[in-house]
Amino acid sequence: MSDISVEKLTELEAAAELERLARAIAHHDELYHAKDRPEISDAAYDALKRRNEAIEAHFPALVRDDSPSRRVGAAPALAIFAPVVHARPMLSLDNAFSDEDVRDFVGSVYRFLGQLPDDSIAFTAEPKIDGLSMSIRYENGILVSGATRGDGTTGENVTANIRTIAEIPNRLPAGAPAVVEVRGEVYMAKSDFLTLNAQMEAEGKQTYVNPRNTAAGSLRQLDAKVTASRKLRFFAYAWGEMSDMPADTQLGMVEVFRQWGFPVNPLMKRFNSVDGLLAHYRAIGMERPTLDYDIDGVVYKVDRLDLQTRLGFRSRSPRWAIAHKFPAEQALTILRGIDIQVGRTGALTPVARLEPITVGGVVVTNATLHNEDYIKGIGQKGEPIREGRDIRIGDSVIVQRAGDVIPQIVDVVLEEGKKRGEPYQFPHVCPACGSHAVREEGEAVRRCTGGLICPAQAVERIRHFVSRNAFDIEGLGEKQVEFFFNAEDPALCIRSPADIFTLKKRQENSLTKLQNIEGFGATSVKKLYDAIDARREIALHRFLFGLGIRHVGEVNAKRLARAYLSYAAFKKAALEAVPPKEGDRTDKGSEAWQDMLAVEGIGSIVAEAVVDFYGEPHNREVLAALLAEVTPLDEEARVATGSPVEGKTVVFTGSLERMSRDEAKAMAERHGAKTAGSVSKKTDLVVAGPGAGSKLAKATELGIEVINEDDWFKLVGED
């Protein structure tokens, strides 16, 4: 996961990271919900989700249709069990990771409901069982189906296996509603897990990893006898469809479940204050090691069901409940070395090589060190961390399985009398390509400036180069780019942008013909070559955007193209721009530097990124090869349009029925307007279609003019 703060991400970096996060979270959802073999800890997964949500909040225009924030769980993986559509969706819960998060949750409940006295709303608190969510349906008192959560909408029918769990009644007592869906968690007790593993070991079979995965796998057995032998258990805590509600509170419903014969958790209690909830959270945390089942937090719910109804739901979670997660587990080990990894955006990330240690049941050999400052003992705001202690090779360190894809080092334990190693010197060159690694002012991350030549960044750079708003080469999708990049045959490989345009020529005299490779054919290869040839002349702003210069996203590429009009002029400016000397207030930088800063919307950060890019010899070599194949077209000088929206900032929101978002954007720019992805005080006009939500509300709040799509067409004279 990236260590760059969300506020410092460029639009290009944010879009790329959201794409990676969507793929990663979907992958881990499938492993956890559908295949019962997770690769990362719950804390690491939560960190991915939090990072995704933070980026979406900062870049609302980039929210993807397949965003993890709109999805619950994973679709059933195999057709072994028949699908079951839940009468009411089985949603997930939002997470709290601190006392402050819990106070914010309770505060949000009071704010939403409005004008209720303090401490007048009761909340229940119960352990969050680490098992498999299950919905059990009864009709006229008889168990008719059991279904897993699946993706929240559709689960798997595991009725035969559910019937083998002794703690789940096959019949409900007389007087139960005609339709009842009891929901809860199927789990395996720790003691039963240890007994099962001892039995497997005695039989010379492979043992299981943990109780949660074992319970999930046991429930998906084709032979119900196998499920029966695994001694699965159940806690009831929620419900789905009910033809009649037998109680009016959360606690009352759970008590009804107990009376019907379901096991319910004895640690569930009700409180009227945040302090009571937090005290119970800590009490359960203290009792956690002695429990015979795994838990990973405490769930808080508004107790009154009428208030739950008023609070309602977000897209994938209820407003009236939250899961307060337990902190990560820690262990002490030795730091044996520090490796530098180069990410797809050029960030140099230090990774600790550790003496192997078991943390929370997982053997850990590597941990993240975040960045250069973290190793030195400096925090994100320049404050000392770990009491200012730096991290050195040979140190005893505390490792925590927490909010990163790999664990992290959280502290150093200095041993009296033991001589420490030398302070770690962070590299100033990229280990992947040898280019300079620079650190921008105000950033903790050091980045490779190799860009187009760096192998660690190459795949991502080429994907960006051929993307829709850059060179837009049809037939070079994600899979095709990876295929060409990994190809060892010189007649097939694409390692730099210029290689795309020499592919056809290299193929002419090659024995390895592209059309003979699986996935390609004569027709598709011809289309690919035609698509490539169609981009040998390219608009200047697309060319600049395609280079992937840091901070030069689509908007800034257009600003630079309109300012310099030709690539020759832009290149000359980039090579002649010299920033002011650091600390010299009288130095304003070169004339070319001052001219670049004079371009609307281009500040010193963007200008420095351009200068760094062109200052790297490797990049100039790659550009020379590319320009031998491609011609950037001069930009037409903008003339006054006389349009009523000229010079204004426009935001489009909601569903557009007469044009796509790209068409709307192009139309606005054609009339001299600028478009933005979010509403702010700088917004002049909002065009709102059906389904407009937060942006429309923000515009109304700020008093910004709002019109519909038809009025927009009339306004710009294209009706």
UniProtKB/Swiss-Prot annotation:
**Residues binding NAD(+), per UniProt:** 42-46, 92-93, 126, 149, 185, 301, 325
Please tell me which top-level EC class this enzyme sits in: ligase
BRCT domain location is: 640-719
Do you know which Pfam families this protein is assigned to? BRCT (PF00533), DNA_ligase_aden (PF01653), DNA_ligase_OB (PF03120), DNA_ligase_ZBD (PF03119), HHH_2 (PF12826)
Please give the Gene Ontology molecular function terms for this protein: DNA ligase (NAD+) activity; metal ion binding
Q: Which residues form the active site?
A: 128
UniProt EC number:
6.5.1.2
Q: What cofactor does this protein call for?
A: Mg(2+); Mn(2+)
| Family matches, as InterPro entries | BRCT_dom (IPR001357), BRCT_dom_sf (IPR036420), DisA/LigA_HHH (IPR041663), DNA_ligase (IPR001679), DNA_ligase_AS (IPR018239), DNA_ligase_CS (IPR033136), DNAligase_adenylation (IPR013839), DNAligase_N (IPR013840)
A GO CC term attached to the entry: cytosol
Q: Which GO terms describe its biological process?
A: DNA repair; DNA replication
User: Which interval of the chain is the signal sequence?
Assistant: none
Q: Which UniProt keywords apply?
A: DNA damage, DNA repair, DNA replication, Ligase, Magnesium, Manganese, Metal-binding, NAD, Zinc
Xref: SUPFAM superfamilies:
BRCT domain, DNA ligase/mRNA capping enzyme, catalytic domain, Nucleic acid-binding proteins, RuvA domain 2-like
Q: Which reaction does it catalyse?
A: NAD(+) + (deoxyribonucleotide)n-3'-hydroxyl + 5'-phospho-(deoxyribonucleotide)m = (deoxyribonucleotide)n+m + AMP + beta-nicotinamide D-nucleotide
Which amino acids does the record list as binding Zn(2+)?
430, 433, 448, 454
Asked if the Swiss-Prot or TrEMBL record annotates the protein with the keyword Zinc, the reply is: yes
What PANTHER family does its record include? Answer: CHROMOSOME TRANSMISSION FIDELITY FACTOR 18 (PTHR23389), DNA LIGASE (PTHR23389:SF9)
- Please give the function described in this protein's UniProt entry: DNA ligase that catalyzes the formation of phosphodiester linkages between 5'-phosphoryl and 3'-hydroxyl groups in double-stranded DNA using NAD as a coenzyme and as the energy source for the reaction. It is essential for DNA replication and repair of damaged DNA.
**What family does the database annotate?**
Belongs to the NAD-dependent DNA ligase family. LigA subfamily.
Name the UniProt record assigns to this protein = DNA ligase
Protein species of origin: Brucella melitensis biotype 1 (strain ATCC 23456 / CCUG 17765 / NCTC 10094 / 16M)
